[in-house]
Curated annotation (Swiss-Prot):
PROSITE patterns xrefs: COMPLEX1_49K
Pfam families the UniProt entry points to: Complex1_49kDa
InterPro entries reported in the protein's UniProt record: NADH_Q_OxRdtase_suD, NADH_UbQ_OxRdtase_49kDa_CS, NDH1_su_D/H, NiFe-Hase_large
Family stated for the protein in its record: Belongs to the complex I 49 kDa subunit family.
Top enzyme class: translocase
Organism: Cupriavidus pinatubonensis (strain JMP 134 / LMG 1197)
EC annotation from Swiss-Prot or TrEMBL: 7.1.1.-
Lineage of source species: Bacteria, Pseudomonadati, Pseudomonadota, Betaproteobacteria, Burkholderiales
Record localization: Cell inner membrane
NCBIfam families: NuoD (TIGR01962), PRK06075.1 (NF004739)
GO cellular component labels: plasma membrane
Annotated protein name in UniProt: NADH-quinone oxidoreductase subunit D
Membrane protein topology class: Peripheral membrane protein
Function in brief: NDH-1 shuttles electrons from NADH, via FMN and iron-sulfur (Fe-S) centers, to quinones in the respiratory chain. The immediate electron acceptor for the enzyme in this species is believed to be ubiquinone. Couples the redox reaction to proton translocation (for every two electrons transferred, four hydrogen ions are translocated across the cytoplasmic membrane), and thus conserves the redox energy in a proton gradient.
Signal peptide from the UniProt entry: none
Amino acid sequence: MADIKNYTLNFGPQHPAAHGVLRLVLELDGEVIQRADPHIGLLHRATEKLAEQKSWIQNVPYMDRLDYVSMMSNEHAYVMAIERLLGIEVPIRAQYIRVMFDEITRLLNHLMWIGAHALDVGAMAVFLYAFREREDMFDMYEAVSGARMHAAYYRPGGVYRDLPDTMPQYRASKVHNERAIKVMNEARSGSLLDFIEDFTNRFPKYVDEYETLLTDNRIWKQRLVDIGVVSPERALQMGFTGPMLRGSGIAWDLRKKQPYEVYDKMDFDVPVGVGGDCYARYLVRVEEMRQSNRIIKQCIEWLRRNPGPVITDNHKVAPPSRVDMKSNMEELIHHFKLFTEGMHVPEGEAYAAVEHPKGEFGIYAISDGANKPYRLKIRAPGFPHLAALDEMAKGHMIADAVTIIGTQDIVFGEIDR
């Protein structure tokens, strides 16, 4: 029999485990990876350049479409950068709403990650469970913004509107009979806060279900333990952030180290992994879901007790209320200018970073005093993680490449921008 020679394999961009449009050129020795070369750019939409043509406010929906699994976290960094340039204060209630939705977004992201990661490795049930929970969180997005995914809910100076007092109800259809609808609408009888609170009470039990299926599962551990090991020093050198850095044993979290909004008032822990392998990163993200649930509960408690404005009263930045606009000439002028020309942001530059579900998501905005950005640089957390794929996959089997891509939690919207 002839000796097995080195050969090259194209992985993706149509592979179900490629998480989008990853094209990976693998150089193999038998079934062992010698080199993994990621080819990016297949989802490049020139977001940074498009942002230079649109007004500051028109760019908010573009942010949703970067990492399209963690929509509101992207918006948050962008509006924070604008607020730093403008030097405006955000009402405290709006800050709590933002923090609450940041954590709901973290749950959305981590549920997508655990479902897809498990499916890649061969466990299908977790995927179905995770999407059951995501459905409830899409309803939360829809209640505040009208959109299930691309919310465009955050605004410079606050949020688009306050939390609604009612939730949409399901109606009987060919798919669900009256009895099923009654069960589905049980949690939807009150306000959005009631609905979110009901979800946070149920959620720890769901995380226990995922852990029952995976954490001590022999096959899961065989596929994840000692795969894609990254030392703490190497993780820092390669620019890792978020769960990828914490999985390697470094307790770095922007919510604790550089608190923004009201994170300094929140009581939560930062999970840190031991070992720096795929299993450590899995445990970190699972614990992060529990901590996010804690933060959401604290926000609900505060928001119930403290009504107030949810957007700045500076009408050069945020539109006046419809009542004021229709009864006051000055407010009408503000409204007209905002929705035609847009606001003018003072000359300067600002960098704002948030602890995005995937790591540090940063926006570096430069203004020349016009109504649109002079330059917008997006710091995507997934980019350095994907750049490390070659180093993490070297010496592993082809099947392990899928596990490593899964543990990196790659989304190409933000990498290709």
